[in-house]
Amino acid sequence: MKHDELAAVILAAGKGTRMKSEQPKVLHPIAGKPMVTFPVAGALKHGCQPTVLVVGHGAEAVQAELAEDPVSFALQSEQLGTGHALLCARQALQEFSGTLLLLCGDVPLLRDETLERLIAEHEKTRAAVTVLTAELSQPFGYGRILREGDEVLGIVEEKDASSEQKTIREINTGIYAFEAPFVFEALSGVGCDNAQREYYLTDVLAAARAAGRRVGAVVLEDADEAMGINDRVQLAQASALMRRRINENLMRAGVSFIDPEQTYIEPQVEIGPDSVIYPGVCLGGDTRIGSGCLIEAQVTIRDCQLADNVHVKPGSVLEGSRVGSDTAIGPMAHLRPGTVLAGHNKIGNFVETKKAHIGLGSKASHLTYIGDAELGANVNIGCGTITCNYDGVNKHKTVIEDDVFVGSDTQFVAPVHIGRNSLIGAGSTITKDVPPNALALSRSQQRVVADWRLRHDPKCKNKD
């Protein structure tokens, strides 16, 4: 939906004492991403320009985390309440006259659809203030919404509320839509005559009422969206809610989960329909998984692209790799960054690859290291094969062309080039290039000494 001019201020200055951490509270992760990135993404998705973050404790760390986002920052050097925090952003918004959203950096679960409802209601009613509210069975600690019928009269904080007001279940989420010029004018007249000696943003509602302006409200359909994070217990609770939301969205899109409560997927991960995800799987970063894939238990995949019909067996780790279709990986395989599998491959148990391009149909079934290597199509790598790529100073490349058969327990001392359709005998150490269609052997000739043990081992002398 097209909206009037939009801007956003995101409050991210709090120290988060109850987190008991040197790290700023808003940088603690939810589903693998710093929690502040969720409201930032929501504001930017709705076209909020400018988007201003009010920072304080750990300001440099927060700025560094968001350095690539089109946002600006305002410093709140002293924590004097939410009203004071918004005033700190005034200079960055002095030319702005549209709808101003106020979001919280420690409220990461707010859905885009909810933000859309808040904006639409605020613009439709032409209110000076529209507050996002929620109904809680246990509202202790939250500011209560004071109403007269459908009209919002104000908000009273927990420490300032009367006994009767504390029975109200509708609470302030701390998320607002304001008419920008009005809110800054109203804040200029706000004092700190309250129990906390802070500048309450909620006093703006009283100023709007006094000016005869409308104060509106939008009630959350799901109160969990307004969950603020103040300690590590709430961090874990919010993480579980986000995980459930991500997994349910994927299930509705055609992905099967054996146990969604034990599966950890970051929000930007994409999975195609008819894929099956087992418990203990962790998928993160820029990961895209195709259709019909099977990801078995205790697999970790980060920053990888998997084509259709890929089978990743238990205990495998994939990082920064591309995997072609109809490929089997694992169990207990490790694909390190720079691995590219063309498709129809087998990378078996205890195989490690790094900066390896492996051609169509090639396989390494077990106990192998392939690093800084280029393999052609239909190459068979025998058990125990190692590309010796590092000389203590530099890395070197191994090239193995199409249709090569490599026997077990082979070492390729790079740089080395193996021609197509050649055969490498088991137990060989290959230090020189091998031409196409050749047999290469480097092991010594077998020698048999008859009765050697009977002559040299006292334990065996009486067994003749």
Curated annotation (Swiss-Prot):
InterPro entries: Bifunctional_GlmU, GlmU-like, GlmU_C_LbH, Hexapep, MobA-like_NTP_Trfase, Nucleotide-diphossugar_trans, Trimer_LpxA-like_sf. Binds 1 Mg(2+) ion per subunit. Residues 1-232 are annotated as: Pyrophosphorylase. Residues 233-253 are annotated as: Linker. SUPFAM superfamilies: Nucleotide-diphospho-sugar transferases (SSF53448), Trimeric LpxA-like enzymes (SSF51161). GO terms for molecular function: glucosamine-1-phosphate N-acetyltransferase activity; magnesium ion binding; UDP-N-acetylglucosamine diphosphorylase activity. Acetyl-CoA binds at residues 389-390, 408, 426, 443. Keywords: Acyltransferase, Cell shape, Cell wall biogenesis/degradation, Cytoplasm, Magnesium, Metal-binding, Multifunctional enzyme, Nucleotidyltransferase, Peptidoglycan synthesis, Repeat, Transferase. Pathway: Nucleotide-sugar biosynthesis; UDP-N-acetyl-alpha-D-glucosamine biosynthesis; N-acetyl-alpha-D-glucosamine 1-phosphate from alpha-D-glucosamine 6-phosphate (route II): step 2/2; Nucleotide-sugar biosynthesis; UDP-N-acetyl-alpha-D-glucosamine biosynthesis; UDP-N-acetyl-alpha-D-glucosamine from N-acetyl-alpha-D-glucosamine 1-phosphate: step 1/1; Bacterial outer membrane biogenesis; LPS lipid A biosynthesis. In the N-terminal section; belongs to the N-acetylglucosamine-1-phosphate uridyltransferase family. In the C-terminal section; belongs to the transferase hexapeptide repeat family. This is Bifunctional protein GlmU.
